Amino acid sequence: DPKETWAFITWTMFAIYLHTRTNPNFQSANSAIVAFLGFIIIWICYFGVNLLGIGLHSYGSFNLH
């Protein structure tokens, strides 16, 4: 299911973000880049996956007719 896959990708990205924030070896710019990528992934998960219209949650897809 694409929504579950992209939700997993989102959770993974923000787990990476939390690890970059708590690890003193990484600079703050690295965590800002990861947070920005996580924000982009959230937009893909919210809008892009709904445009696919496949999977178990296809009732929540946009109609482009």
From Swiss-Prot:
Keywords: Chloroplast, Cytochrome c-type biogenesis, Membrane, Plastid, Thylakoid, Transmembrane, Transmembrane helix
Signal peptide start and end residues: none
Pfam families: Cytochrom_C_asm (PF01578)
Membrane spanning residue stretches: 5-19, 32-52
Coiled coil: none
Membrane topology: Multi-pass membrane protein
GO biological process, one term: cytochrome complex assembly
One GO CC annotation: plasma membrane
Compartments (UniProt record): Plastid, Chloroplast thylakoid membrane
Predominant location category: plastid
Single annotated GO MF: heme binding
Purpose: Required during biogenesis of c-type cytochromes (cytochrome c6 and cytochrome f) at the step of heme attachment.
Family: Belongs to the CcmF/CycK/Ccl1/NrfE/CcsA family.
Assembly with partners or alone: May interact with Ccs1.
Name of the protein this chain belongs to: Cytochrome c biogenesis protein CcsA
Provenance organism: Oenothera berteroana
Gene: ccsA
